[in-house]
Amino acid sequence: MSSGVERDARSLPWYRQVDADQWRAFWATFLGWVLDGFDFTILTFILIDIQESFTIDRALAGALGTVTLLMRLVGGAAAGTAADRWGRRLPLMLSILWFSLFAGLSGFSTSYAMLFAFRALFGIGMGGEWAAGMPLVLEHWPVHLRGIASGLLQGGYSWGFILSSVVFTFVYPVLTPYGELAWRTMFWLGIGPALLVLWIRKRVPESPVWLERQRHLKETRRPDGVSLLRIFRRDLLPTTIQCSVLIGSFMFSYYSITFWYATFLRERGQTTLSYLVALNVGGILGSYVWGRASEGRPGRRGAATVAALIGVGMVPLYLYATSPGLLFLGALLMGFFGAGMWGVVPTYLSERFPTSARGVGAGFSYHAGAALGSLTPFVVGAFQDRGWALPDAMATCIVGALLLSTGMLWLGPETRGRRLLALDGE
């Protein structure tokens, strides 16, 4: 009987197979990730202003991005451990409040050192939001729709980038006559996401998989056993290492594509909005397409590999096109392939770890990868300080990281179709 009901459900469009609680869990994490993306990417538009305000070189400006990515590891590990022990919702809410606070405080910085500290603290909240939110959604959604959920969720970061692009284009120019107030206001807008917490607290349910595990532990009087050290034990250590290096290569490629792109466009004399929208619309569409493709024959690894290799081929069009039309096309296609391959990441990482370590395992691996990739803004900036043209520095990093990504994907198992059970791995 249950199989017949399942077949009837699958005959519906996929979005009608998702119930209200599952959608609320999705929107909570998705909107948090959109706003997280806005708060991080707005920095890329105002690096030149920050250089001028604090009289720093490009390497130090890039280090503001680097320290944020490094500190995401702290947030991912802490919130992931908390999510496995106390549930997914509470760490998600606290992480959103945390990154909103320090995004806003960044606008009050009176020195480079103060701004550096605030961006480091912002990174902790940014890491926590992903670590708690992704398991919340993927443990709610049906197993056969997890790839779609993954792609839609990860595309939220691109929506955040579009939002920061629009705000910079239309709000920033109004404030430029007021000097430093312009770039400081871009940071102050980042406090807005804190309002999302009120809705999450009232409307978003806890993960049913996590709740089932807690019921079982209570009935059997077993200790919880949740610990950061769990992912470094013999059974999970290879998974933790492979996933961390994999995400590091993904991060290095993504930030090579995006972090200095607004500066690249300004140096080319182009208005940034249309190209950044193209890049991120490509990322949104690509995340959905490759996430959905990962549910089919290619699997998680195959879908991401195809996207990455085609992304390598898009580099000349993305960085060296001579006409605005071709430059626009390059942005769209690089987004679709080079950024779109991220659509498989949330579900792949969630499927690699058991429920007892899913938050901390996926969160730590994702943000350990971010820490490895955190060198990207600094490296690209350092190449320029040594005489490299910005397109050459970006291209070298993009190609190298995408090729490394394809190799790392195949060092781990295929996970498509793996069920997320309350007691898996115990």
Give residue spans per PLM region.
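Glycine-rich segments within core transmembrane alpha-helices of 12-TM secondary carriers
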Residues: 147-172, 193, 366-377
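C-terminal transmembrane helical hairpin of 12-TM major facilitator-type secondary transporters
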Residues: 299-345
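Conserved MFS/SLC helix-loop-helix module at the cytosolic interface between two early adjacent transmembrane helices
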Residues: 74-110
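Cytosolic juxtamembrane N-terminal segment immediately preceding the first transmembrane helix
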Residues: 1-38
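Helix-to-loop junctions at the C-terminal end of transmembrane segments
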Residues: 76-87, 287-299
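Cytoplasmic membrane-interface "Motif A"-like loop-to-helix N-cap segments
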Residues: 85-95, 296-308
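Extracytoplasmic gate region of multi-pass secondary transporters
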Residues: 44, 235-284
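Helix-breaking motifs and short loop linkers at transmembrane-helix boundaries and internal kinks
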Residues: 55, 87, 108-114, 142, ...
